[in-house]
Amino acid sequence: MTDTAKPTDATKKEEPWREAVEQRLAEAPVRSSGTAQVGTGSGAQRIDYDFIAQYIPVVSDGLSAKPGEPEAAVYTLAYLAHAQGSGATSRPLLFAFNGGPGSSSVWLHLGALGPKRVHINEDGTMPAPPYAVEDNPYSWFEHFDLVFIDPPHTGYSVSASEDARKRHLSVDGDVSALAEVMRAWLARHQRFGSAVYLAGESYGTTRGAALADKMLDLGVALSGVILVSCAMDLQTLVFQAGNDLPHSLFLPGFAATAQYHGKLKGALNDAAAARVAAEAFVLEDYLVALHRGATLTAAQRSKLAKRIGELSGLPAALVEQQNLRITDQTFFTQLLRDEGRVVGRLESRVSGPMAARRGYAMEFDPGIEAIVAPYASAVNGYFAQLGIDTQRRYGIINGEVNQGWHWGRGPVDGKGKMSGNGYTNTTVDLSRALRRNPHLRVLVASGHYDLGTPYSATNYSLAQLDVDAEQLKRIEHHYYDAGHMMYTRPADLRKLKDDLAAWLARA
């Protein structure tokens, strides 16, 4: 071998990545069959299905250094109903993924959509172990064949090189990879004759909104997009100096949470009344006050602080000390501070104990802690039943993906930096998709007790879509009395399914 033919250090470094991708793509699909018990009472039905878990390659495009080579192996898990004749390949198909952005699809898979689910207590708290799956009578399998996707570096999915990893851990690179996975899956299973839907949760709505537009570039016009706990416009969610939007958009959620925990008085001690009062205050007074900023008089500041305190359950003096701007961290650690407890972020009905030395930053989110262990244990047991090798670790949540994510828009340069700037916002993509595809419909679901992606922030994001009145009619927004993963509450699991069925019937 000549010197020029010797592998470089970079090539040697990438060999384990590429070997991992090649090994996964060479594995045979895992297949099994089962019967889903869907519905309750006289409406109950049994649906026989085939289960297929397999890796789908993300193939490099013609602009990459090695066009045609797989740059990732992405794990997919599909439930395909038995059907007669042509119905087998024409049944509506739903692709689903979660967010993070470093999360696997386990939450939607075993929380709401799939034929099995993990039980969580009615009030959002953690049940006692051990954990296992149970039948899900409100599975969406009644309406669609289901395909769950784990993006690169979640679940069992991996990229083939460091350069590919950098691309995939970015807003647009992630969208391109998942679009290719869906296209390839449709081709492999000959399902281009099916109506195609997407469902995304949290950051999955960020990617879902962008995919509605991206899939059109690949010749796939979606019939519908379902957005659960929206995070399309990060400016509405990120508390940062100079960005006043979250202070106003979180207040109705703060009010709902404070009322739930018994911190509001008088007429505000009613869930609906507290939300309505906070929404009205934001529109009529708070946004104007934030706009005026330092020009407010002392009397005006005092009056505003008093009202914000009444709505949030926090002392007016604290509100004034915070310059009339309550952050999520302040709310989480202050609302129940006298009880030594911290409020949950993703499920604010849940609270957890503070350390004896009470800090001012959230040590952990009791809302998410309540579900991680049950889901992690249950999914491994369920995968073993399906014949999936659980010796390989299934990444429920990959914190390294979250930490290494590139939030700008545009291509990644050689140093892993993005050409874009500002807050990530895919409402522009969804707006364009609604203009390009006259048949695209959107269903949105928000929890009143979600302080990660508050319902009021979603209201704002939807109102900012660059569409006309007729296009806006193709969007429905429904609300639930739980948090980010509202489907962990059985009543809202059923309501979500009922809202979906009614939405589909109106098509």
Q: Across the structure, where does each feature detected by a protein language model lie?
A:
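N-terminal cap/lid subdomain of alpha/beta-hydrolase-fold enzymes
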Residues: 6, 10-16, 63-167
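A catalytic-pocket lid/entrance helix-loop region that shapes and gates access to the active site
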Residues: 115-119, 215-312
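Alpha/beta-hydrolase active-site loop
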Residues: 141-144, 151, 168-186
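Short alpha-helix in the alpha/beta-hydrolase fold that links the catalytic acid
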Residues: 440, 454-464
